[in-house]
């Protein structure tokens, strides 16, 4: 857990805390970038090949603060002691070119590659392209564990970066091209098949791996077809043999079968005849519909000139109506004057009528008064007679008072009863609300529990089935049995569920917890042995650990960011909690925060805790048995899956008890309501009886008083009527005088009115003349409009007729389709299936454009529905005469015959398909295998030469046990390092580590001269080699990687032998570190060279 020291090296134009210098003796001239933020892309077309790495920049990456590496175009040897940061450059190449973090074998999250204590890091790779260099930048955010990508300083996505990298044939995930330090051992573990695939992708043409994959798919389908053909052939032979045994019995059935076949053909033809009848009707309707459509078009064209003429007549009508309106205005004025005179005359007439009417009214009033006086006298006489006959009224008031008191008492009782009913109703409503609230709470609890059980059922079905069995059989156990731990645990805060799930293995999370060994044996015998369910069971400790105190107080740990022990994060039954404390020490494992992770080194050193949880990681701390050093490892926490749902079972039981109490109270309230309603009903009945008695007594008491009041009232009315008299003769004289005066005034007004009528008549004559002209115009216009309306009506009728015909056509078309579908179903034809030509007699056209056909045998059958129905009846009668035959045998025989025919056809089709697959395989195999053999032969030649130069033997061949199993093809590497042994296949176990490293290196060098990739990376491949082999391998690497037109090569090593041969084309990059290194901005390469030369020159010879 020690923090890496700052690394420095030779000067670099860009300031940095760590940089890689060039060896002055082997430095290849190149243009270096200055420190400006916007850097121009390198456009050099020197010895670099397309896709080679020109520059690598890192900021806050692993051990580096800031570093820039400028590799050469050929062999780049990166040298440095272990831990200086050589492999960090390899990681930068991988991650910078969109490689997966897990491929490096160091961490599975990209955030772990950022230098500790930094929140962001950056890797930038510049790749050579003739059209302009490609600069790929990857910025890493530690908090989000997220990357941000840029191409030539422009934001982009990882997918586009991967496409750009793939276009340059760069495969950072291929061990034949990119072999990091942690993957060197895995190369030897590659199977022959994996090695072939990696080699194809690395140096083969692009289509080679595609052909190989296509061959594997074709071969797999060929095997399936071969197996299918073999199975169908064997089954077909069995079916034929079985039918031969029943042939004699079936022949006796043929006569009956002939009739049944004819019935079947008749039933099959019947829907075709129905279809043909409807189709002919459809064709007839379609012809009529087309004729009507043409008629509609002609009617619409004929209406255009009529419309124009109507508009002309309308304009003329407007002019005449304007003149008529002027005359009407003059007439209106004259008529108004006439009206005024006439109104005055009418008022005079009305006045005379009113005088006459007033006189008549007075006459009628006098007659009515005399009649009313007579009627009143007779009524008084009748009332007096009735009063005499009425008996003296007895004293009824005491009885009325007694009934009134009884009514008041009953009303009080009713009010009291109604109040109690209202109280009961309110009490019941309150209880119902409480019941609904409790029911809702229980439903929510059940939903949460169902969620947990659904997760258990989906992931561990056997455990779920065992839970159901346990719930139905708890009586078989003597002591308490807890359901699986994941169901009984309830998190206090769901966000902490990840700590529990990462701490307790899933096998124990789904385990049942028992308090008794005997109970557990009963359970396992029933569930595991009898029901064959795979379940886990554990026993809780006899003495409870649930309340055991931790070894140190949480207050001591809060300074490091710890907020709780695991035990305090959840609730569980005592047996479960006791088991977890005993088995997993959850009372001793603290949970911290991000603050804990930031101080993790201090926490580990000072607390000596064995297990620690931070916000997102788990740390396991151990002490070395030999060196007593503290060793820690950390893993990222997995997301919680099971414990995020929390159910409080104790609270649910409390709610169920509460619900039972509410039900009991509701029953008591309902009983009280029934009794109160009966009491209220009885009181209501008694109240009605008393009111009726009181009403009868009051009527008897008030009758005499009413008669006396009526007689007194009538006598007063009679006196008033006798006093109200009228003089009719005087009234008649006054009315006659007033009428004469009014008639004189009326005669004068009539003369004035006559003169005004003459003027008005003249104006009317002039207006009538204009109206006649307008009428002529309107008549002509109306005639045109009538013709237009008639034509429009005819058009609407024709259009309606067209719509009806079109709807009928659609209906018939749909019916045709339905009949055709039914007919095809009867003939067992699919939607797109047609009958063979030899069974067709005619091809009627279906309205939807498809064609169908009638079987040839139909032509010998009747062509009308009546004839078909008659023949069907006859044939059915004949078929029913055949008895005593076993239809089951015939059905089985026929079914087998059909299956035999179907299998024969299927077998033919399968064989044809199989031949096609074999032909395709042959073609693809030729395109794939021949180039592959040539490629492997070239690899073998290079590989053998390299081994021969080392006085060893090695060969590479294309290996397969069966030439047809294309998924089993592989590249086999066989090596021999001693003359006394035979060639042995390269495996992780047979050869030593150094021998595997030599073999791996030489194989990669063999690929180097054939490779299409722009660069190759090999990290610390020489570890474990003896000095002789290491020297030989190094010489071959230099010779191979420094040839003209070869791809770029990165060779990372922590050590070098003395007096190794070097090439002018290779680049040596040294990696230094240490607390006393100079800062990059103070490093001056030229000054260092000058001082070095002075020291060399001044040394005594």
Swiss-Prot record:
Q: Where in the cell is it found?
A: Nucleus; Chromosome; Nucleus, PML body; Chromosome, Telomere
UniProt-listed GO biological process terms = cell division; cellular senescence; chromatin looping; chromosome condensation; chromosome segregation; DNA damage response; double-strand break repair via homologous recombination; mitotic cell cycle phase transition
Q: Does the keyword Cell division apply?
A: yes
Q: Which UniProt keywords apply?
A: ATP-binding, Cell cycle, Cell division, Chromosome, Coiled coil, Disease variant, DNA damage, DNA recombination, DNA repair, Mitosis, Nucleotide-binding, Nucleus, Phosphoprotein, Telomere, Ubl conjugation
Residues annotated for ATP binding in this entry: 80-87
Tell me where the transmembrane regions lie.
none
Residue ranges the record marks as coiled coil: 207-445, 647-828, 888-927
Q: Does the keyword Kinase apply?
A: no
Q: Positions modified as Phosphoserine?
A: 25, 35
Bias (Low complexity) ranges: 1-17
Q: Name one GO cellular component term.
A: chromosome, centromeric region
User: Which GO molecular function terms does the record list?
Assistant: ATP binding; ATP hydrolysis activity; DNA secondary structure binding; single-stranded DNA binding
What's the subunit arrangement here? Forms a heterodimer with SMC6. Component of the SMC5-SMC6 complex which consists at least of SMC5, SMC6, NSMCE2, NSMCE1, NSMCE4A or EID3 and NSMCE3. Interacts with NSMCE2. Interacts with SLF2; this interaction induces an association of the SLF1-SLF2 complex with the SMC5-SMC6 complex. Interacts with RAD18; this interaction is increased in a SLF1 or SLF2-dependent manner. (Microbial infection) SMC5-SMC6 complex interacts with Hepatitis B X protein.
Q: What does this protein do?
A: Core component of the SMC5-SMC6 complex, a complex involved in repair of DNA double-strand breaks by homologous recombination. The complex may promote sister chromatid homologous recombination by recruiting the SMC1-SMC3 cohesin complex to double-strand breaks. The complex is required for telomere maintenance via recombination in ALT (alternative lengthening of telomeres) cell lines and mediates sumoylation of shelterin complex (telosome) components which is proposed to lead to shelterin complex disassembly in ALT-associated PML bodies (APBs).
Comment block on domains: The flexible hinge domain, which separates the large intramolecular coiled coil regions, allows the heterotypic interaction with the corresponding domain of SMC6, forming a V-shaped heterodimer.
Q: What is this protein called?
A: Structural maintenance of chromosomes protein 5
**Which lineage ranks, top first, belong to the organism behind this chain?**
Eukaryota, Metazoa, Chordata, Craniata, Vertebrata
Give the encoding gene's name.
SMC5
């Amino acid at each position: 857990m020690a923090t890496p020291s700052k690394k420095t090296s030779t000067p670099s134009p860009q300031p940095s805390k760590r940089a890689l210098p060039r060896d002055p003796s082997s430095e290849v001239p190149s243009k270096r970038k200055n420190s400006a933020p916007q850097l121009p892309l390198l456009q050099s077309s020197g010895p670099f090949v397309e896709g080679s790495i020109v520059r690598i920049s890192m900021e806050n990456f692993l051990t580096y603060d800031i570093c820039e590496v400028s590799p050469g175009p050929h062999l780049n040897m990166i040298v440095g002691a272990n831990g200086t940061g050589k492999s960090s450059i390899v990681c930068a190449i991988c991650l910078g070119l969109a490689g997966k973090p897990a491929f490096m074998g160091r961490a599975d999250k990209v955030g772990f590659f950022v230098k500790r204590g930094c929140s962001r890091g950056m890797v930038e790779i510049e790749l050579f392209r003739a059209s302009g260099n490609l600069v790929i930048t990857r910025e890493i955010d530690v908090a989000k564990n997220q990357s941000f990508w840029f191409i030539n300083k422009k934001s982009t996505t990882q997918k586009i970066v991967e496409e750009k990298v793939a276009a340059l044939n760069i495969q950072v995930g291929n061990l034949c091209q990119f072999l990091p330090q942690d993957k060197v051992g895995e190369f030897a573990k590659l199977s022959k098949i994996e090695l072939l695939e990696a080699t194809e992708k690395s140096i083969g043409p692009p289509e080679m791996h595609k052909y190989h994959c296509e061959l594997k798919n074709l071969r797999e389908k060929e095997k399936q077809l071969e197996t299918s053909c073999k199975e169908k052939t064997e089954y077909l032979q069995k079916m034929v043999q079985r039918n031969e045994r029943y042939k004699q019995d079936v022949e006796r059935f043929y006569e009956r079968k002939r009739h049944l076949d004819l019935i079947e053909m008749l039933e099959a033809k019947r829907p075709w005849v129905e279809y043909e009848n409807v189709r002919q009707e459809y064709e007839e309707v379609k012809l009529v519909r087309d004729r009507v459509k043409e008629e509609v078009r002609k009617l619409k064209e004929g209406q255009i000139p009529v419309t124009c003429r109507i508009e002309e007549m309308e304009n003329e009508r407007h002019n005449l109506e304007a003149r008529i309106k002027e005359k009407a205005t003059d007439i209106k004025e004259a008529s108004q004057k006439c009206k005024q005179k006439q109104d005055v005359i009418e008022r005079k007439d009305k006045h005379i009528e009113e005088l006459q009417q007033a006189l008549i009214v007075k006459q009628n009033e006098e007659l009515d008064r005399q009649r009313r006086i007579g009627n009143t006298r007779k009524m008084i006489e009748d009332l007096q007679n009735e009063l005499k006959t009425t008996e003296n009224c007895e004293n009824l008031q005491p009885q009325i008072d007694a009934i009134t008191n009884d009514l008041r008492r009953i009303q009080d009782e009713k009010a009291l009863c109604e109040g109690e009913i209202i109280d009961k109703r309110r009490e019941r409503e309150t209880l119902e609300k409480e019941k609904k609230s409790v029911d809702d709470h229980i439903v929510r609890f059940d939903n949460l529990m169902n969620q947990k059980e659904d997760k258990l059922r989906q992931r561990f079905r056997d455990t779920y089935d065992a839970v159901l069995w346990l719930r139905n059989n708890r009586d078989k156990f003597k002591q308490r049995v807890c359901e699986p731990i994941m169901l009984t645990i309830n998190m206090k805060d769901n966000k902490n569920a990840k700590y529990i799930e990462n701490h307790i293995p899933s096998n124990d999370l789904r385990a049942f917890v028992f308090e008794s060994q005997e109970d557990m044996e009963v359970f396992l015998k029933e569930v595991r042995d009898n029901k064959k369910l795979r379940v886990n069971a554990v026993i809780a400790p006899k003495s409870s650990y649930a309340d055991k105190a931790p070894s140190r107080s949480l207050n001591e740990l809060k300074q490091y960011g710890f907020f709780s022990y695991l035990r305090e994060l959840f609730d569980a039954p005592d047996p479960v909690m006791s088991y977890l404390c005993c088995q997993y020490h959850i009372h001793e494992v603290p949970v911290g925060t991000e603050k804990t992770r930031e101080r993790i080194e201090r926490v580990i050193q000072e607390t000596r805790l064995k297990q620690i949880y931070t916000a997102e990681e788990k740390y396991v701390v151990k002490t070395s048995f030999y060196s007593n050093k503290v060793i820690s490892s950390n893993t990222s926490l997995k997301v919680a899956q099971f414990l995020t749902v929390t159910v409080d079972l104790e609270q649910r039981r409390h709610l169920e008890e509460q619900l039972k109490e509410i039900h009991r109270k509701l029953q008591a309230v309902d009983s009280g309501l029934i009794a109160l309603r009966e009491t209220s009903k009885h009181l209501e009945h008694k109240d009605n009886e008393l009111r009726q008695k009181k009403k009868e007594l009051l009527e008897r008491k008030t009758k005499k008083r009413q008669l006396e009041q009526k007689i007194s009232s009538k006598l007063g009315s009679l006196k008033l009527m006798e006093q109200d008299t009228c003089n009719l003769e005087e009234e008649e004289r006054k009315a006659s005088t007033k009428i004469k005066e009014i008639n004189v005034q009326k005669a004068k007004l009539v003369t004035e009115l006559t003169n005004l009528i003459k003027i008005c008549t003249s104006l009317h004559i002039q207006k009538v003349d204009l109206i006649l002209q307008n009428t002529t115009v309107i008549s002509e216009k109306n005639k045109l409009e009538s013709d237009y309306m008639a034509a429009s009506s005819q058009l609407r009728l024709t259009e309606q007729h067209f719509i009806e015909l079109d709807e009928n056509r659609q209906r018939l078309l749909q019916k045709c389709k339905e009949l055709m579908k039914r007919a095809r179903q009867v003939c067992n034809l699919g939607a797109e299936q047609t009958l063979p030509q030899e069974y067709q007699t005619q091809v009627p056209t279906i309205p939807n454009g498809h064609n169908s056909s009638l079987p040839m045998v139909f032509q010998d059958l009747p062509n009308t529905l009546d004839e078909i129905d008659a023949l069907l009846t006859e044939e059915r009668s004949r078929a029913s005469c055949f008895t005593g035959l076993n239809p089951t045998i015939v059905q089985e025989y026929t079914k087998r015959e059909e299956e035999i025919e179907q299998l024969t056809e299927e077998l033919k089709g399968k064989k044809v398909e199989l031949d096609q697959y074999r032909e395709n395989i042959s073609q693809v195999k030729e395109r794939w295998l021949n180039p592959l053999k040539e490629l492997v032969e070239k690899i073998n030649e290079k590989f053998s030469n390299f081994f021969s130069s080392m006085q060893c033997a090695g060969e590479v061949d294309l290996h397969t046990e069966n030439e047809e199993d294309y998924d089993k093809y592989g590249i086999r590497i066989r090596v021999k390092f001693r003359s006394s042994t035979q060639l042995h296949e390269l495996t992780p176990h047979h050869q030593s580590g150094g021998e595997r490293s030599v073999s791996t290196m030489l194989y990669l060098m063999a690929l180097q001269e054939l490779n299409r990739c722009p660069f190759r990376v090999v990290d610390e491949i020489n570890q474990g080699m003896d000095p002789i082999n290491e020297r030989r391998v190094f010489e071959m690497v230099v010779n191979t990687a420094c040839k003209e037109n070869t791809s770029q090569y990165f060779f990372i090593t922590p050590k070098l032998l003395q007096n190794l041969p070097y090439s002018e084309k290779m680049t040596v990059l040294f990696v230094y570190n240490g607390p006393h290194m100079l800062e990059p901005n103070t490093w001056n390469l030229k000054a260092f060279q000058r001082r070095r030369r002075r020291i060399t020159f001044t040394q005594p010879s």
